[in-house]
Amino acid sequence: AENFYYVILYLMVMIGMFSFIIVAILVSTVKSKRREHSNDPYHQYIVEDWQEKYKSQILHFEEAKATIHEN
């Protein structure tokens, strides 16, 4: 009977540690996602300017493709 008590105690400690780790991972993930959608300048640059940068790169690529170099 005493052995069975230690088995239950061991299982409860292991489940508690596992639960603590899972909760810590979830909380850190939620915090990082919340911080990601803030109004910091880097995030605003990504949200607003990436399409303009992409279009300018495509136009520059098209210009470079049409260039003829003579020897």
UniProtKB/Swiss-Prot annotation:
Cited InterPro entries: K_chnl_KCNE
Pfam families reported for this sequence: ISK_Channel
Membrane-spanning residues: 7-27
Keyword Nucleotidyltransferase: no
GO cellular component terms given for this protein: apical plasma membrane; plasma membrane; voltage-gated potassium channel complex
Expression sites (tissue/organ): Detected in heart; expression is highest in the SA node and the right atrium, and barely detectable in the ventricle.
Compartment(s) of residence: Cell membrane; Apical cell membrane
Positions in the Cytoplasmic compartment: 28-71
GO BP annotations listed: negative regulation of delayed rectifier potassium channel activity; potassium ion export across plasma membrane; regulation of heart rate by cardiac conduction; regulation of ventricular cardiac muscle cell membrane repolarization
Membrane topology of this protein: Single-pass type I membrane protein; Single-pass membrane protein
Tagged with keyword Lipoprotein: no
GO molecular function per UniProt: delayed rectifier potassium channel activity; potassium channel regulator activity; transmembrane transporter binding; voltage-gated potassium channel activity involved in ventricular cardiac muscle cell action potential repolarization
Domain of life where this protein originates: Eukaryota
Quaternary structure note: Interacts with KCNB1. Associates with KCNH2/ERG1. May associate with KCNQ2 and KCNQ3. Associates with HCN1 and probably HCN2. Heteromultimer with KCNC2. Interacts with KCNC2. Interacts with KCNQ1; forms a heterooligomer complex that targets to the membrane raft and leading to currents with an apparently instantaneous activation, a rapid deactivation process and a linear current-voltage relationship and decreases the amplitude of the outward current.
Family: Belongs to the potassium channel KCNE family.
Function description: Ancillary protein that functions as a regulatory subunit of the voltage-gated potassium (Kv) channel complex composed of pore-forming and potassium-conducting alpha subunits and of regulatory beta subunits. KCNE2 beta subunit modulates the gating kinetics and enhances stability of the channel complex. Alters the gating of the delayed rectifier Kv channel containing KCNB1 alpha subunit. Associates with KCNH2/HERG alpha subunit Kv channel to form the rapidly activating component of the delayed rectifying potassium current (IKr) in heart.
Protein name (record): Potassium voltage-gated channel subfamily E member 2
Source organism (scientific name): Oryctolagus cuniculus
Gene symbol of the encoding locus: KCNE2
